[in-house]
Amino acid sequence: MTLNLCVLTPNRIVWDSKVKEIILSTNSGQIGILPNHAPIATAVDIGILRIRLNDQWLTMALMGGFARIGNNEITVLVNDAEKGSDIEPQEAQQTLEIAEANLRKAEGKRQIIEANLALRRARTRVEAINVTS
């Protein structure tokens, strides 16, 4: 039995195919979704989406949004998403270093909040490359 997974951003469809299982980062922690999962709607946190196709696991960096699960259909609507295999490791590492430097230099609540958010996004992209299952 499989699930139909569709990952959408405002500009494109990132993923639309059948999967065996996913592990999704939500605002209340990670949840595993298998076929015949109970229907839910949940907020998606900045984090890694793990996708199992047969015996292979793939990763995707998600930048926050919402997910709806029901009737073996999973729809994930996010601000942005990148497949781990599409992320350039050197560029992701440079972005992480810049985000860390910007956080150290941040002054005032707004700059600190924005710098923390950029750092979380950068860490998620690096993690999507480095995750092995």
From Swiss-Prot:
It comes from Vitis vinifera. Belongs to the ATPase epsilon chain family. Produces ATP from ADP in the presence of a proton gradient across the membrane. GO terms for molecular function: ATP binding; proton-transporting ATP synthase activity, rotational mechanism. F-type ATPases have 2 components, CF(1) - the catalytic core - and CF(0) - the membrane proton channel. CF(1) has five subunits: alpha(3), beta(3), gamma(1), delta(1), epsilon(1). CF(0) has three main subunits: a, b and c. GO terms for cellular component: chloroplast thylakoid membrane; proton-transporting ATP synthase complex. It is a peripheral membrane protein. InterPro entries: ATP_synth_F1_dsu/esu, ATP_synth_F1_dsu/esu_N, ATP_synth_F1_esu_C, ATPsynth_dsu/esu_N. Keywords: ATP synthesis, CF(1), Chloroplast, Hydrogen ion transport, Ion transport, Membrane, Plastid, Thylakoid, Transport. One of its GO terms (biological process) is proton motive force-driven ATP synthesis. Transmembrane segments: none annotated. This is ATP synthase epsilon chain, chloroplastic. It is found in: Plastid, Chloroplast thylakoid membrane. Pfam families: ATP-synt_DE, ATP-synt_DE_N. It comes from the Eukaryota.
